[in-house]
Amino acid sequence: MASTVMSSLSLKPTFTLEKISVKGLPSLTRSSSSFKVVASGVKKLKTDKPYGINGSMALRDGVDASGRKPKGKGVYQYVDKYGANVDGYSPIYNTDEWSPSGDVYVGGTTGLAIWAVTLLGILAGGALLVYNTSALAQ
């Protein structure tokens, strides 16, 4: 029995993978050129202090909410390395970037008209979708 199995294994041809090239078809093999991804330099945020109330670490009675004294650990130990906004708190409006007079919309009447048309288009599109999927459309 063992000799039969061994002879049947030795009679089978060895499997070889041949490269067949067809004219007009692109090659699917990878080229030998190396691909290297290089990250850009560290982009620091230019602020005087971290945003948010915790940037100054001004704690009442010198302890945090759990009653422990701060050790200077946490995300704020990386302020000098990564920039001030390390905790991910990023306000939409910064007082340094506010307009001196907030009375006039910078976009003007054209900007307001574009905004209104866009809003009406979104609402009309939603109403059309509701109508088309309701029993009223049939």
Curated annotation (Swiss-Prot):
It comes from the Eukaryota. It is found in: Plastid, Chloroplast thylakoid membrane. Keywords: Chloroplast, Membrane, Photosynthesis, Photosystem II, Plastid, Thylakoid, Transit peptide. Residues 1-39 form a transit peptide. Its main location: plastid. PANTHER family: PHOTOSYSTEM II 10 KDA POLYPEPTIDE, CHLOROPLASTIC. Associated with the oxygen-evolving complex of photosystem II. This is Photosystem II 10 kDa polypeptide, chloroplastic.
